[in-house]
Amino acid sequence: MRQTIKEIETNVAYRWFIGYDFSQPIPHFTTLGKNYVRRFRDTQLFESIFLRILEEAVHHGFVKPDVLFIDATHVKASANKHKYVKEIVEEQAKKYQELLDEEINQDRIAHGKKPLEKKTETSKKEVKVSTTDPDCGLFVKGEKERVFAYSFHTACDRNGFVLGAKVTPGNVHDSQVFEDVLNQVRKTFAQPQAVAVDSGYKTPYISKTLLDDQIRPVMPYTRPRTKEGFFKKHEYVYDEYFDCYICPNEQILTYETTNKDGYRIYRSNSQVCRSCPFLKQCTESKDYTKRVSRHIWADYLEEVDHLRHTEENKQIYSKRKETIERVFADMKEKHGMRWTTLRGLEKVTMQAMLVFAAMNLKKMATWLWKSGRQKVNDQNTFGIFIKLLNKLPLLFVQRGSLSAICETDYGLFFLPFLIDIG
């Protein structure tokens, strides 16, 4: 803000934008800073701006929310990766843990097993917390590099308009925030027909959620994580009728138990495996027993893999590089979001919503201009922005006045954000 005020004192374009003449004194930077703290902290101001611009894009018919593209990207935090403290924290339980526990016990009872006792103690883990910005999270980039970062979980449509976003610490996995982003979009738009995601979201629960809600999941192929020289899991055929697996040597692996993570365990007969010619390609177990796991929601994953081969899924997934990946590329390359200069989850969320609002606004202004529906004097992106702000009566007392206490033009208030994101 200090540098912005300094630039305004000598930059004619900035003065013109905020409506100040050459002789009019510029307010002190603390006037704007304190006014923001008093009026807009802990409010939904920036989300309201984002939604209002998105509403305008919908009005012009530019938004196509029938197919969603959801992904996340990491933005480096304004924090030194060498300045941290180690803390012991409780592991956060999965949002669907109660549903999973209930179905695990039902499955165990159906197989003649006792239900698992409810876990009372919460597991703990050691994490590194930045002393500069405690809200960010340590993100492992590649095999060696570790940086403190934030994750921007984002959803866009087939035209590249951002429909929803959520910011979390960088150590939160993408799949844990998927449902929050999806529900955020569903509050504004009708339920999508399809959702395209990358392999990080290919989990049993997400597959179940989408299929149960009659949403078409569009997910990629994932390579089997098997040691080289060993049989792949798909070479063990599951027999649904007899609830067993058949190994490549046509021997039976019978049900053993269902564990606390929701996986059924099937085991072979060690006496048969001991003399099997494929033993070295099957297992390294010292007791000559092969075990295969299958999640209780594996049927949903199998349906996802079946849909992956359809022409519709192939066409939708091929659009990811033109939609959500393009959004992240523009955000970092054209809007200065390779790293954030702000600290704290609240401020970074504010910055993210402003950046995405600006991206939607610029795309809408460009499309209006190309379609010939925008008047000549309204082609300027800032002009459209001001018109949209005028339609937010809850945010401003009157045009040109940011507050009753501080007589400051709102163009001056938003100028530093537009400089950063423009």
Mark where each language-model region is:
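Anion-binding and metal-coordination hotspots
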Residues: 3-10, 19-422
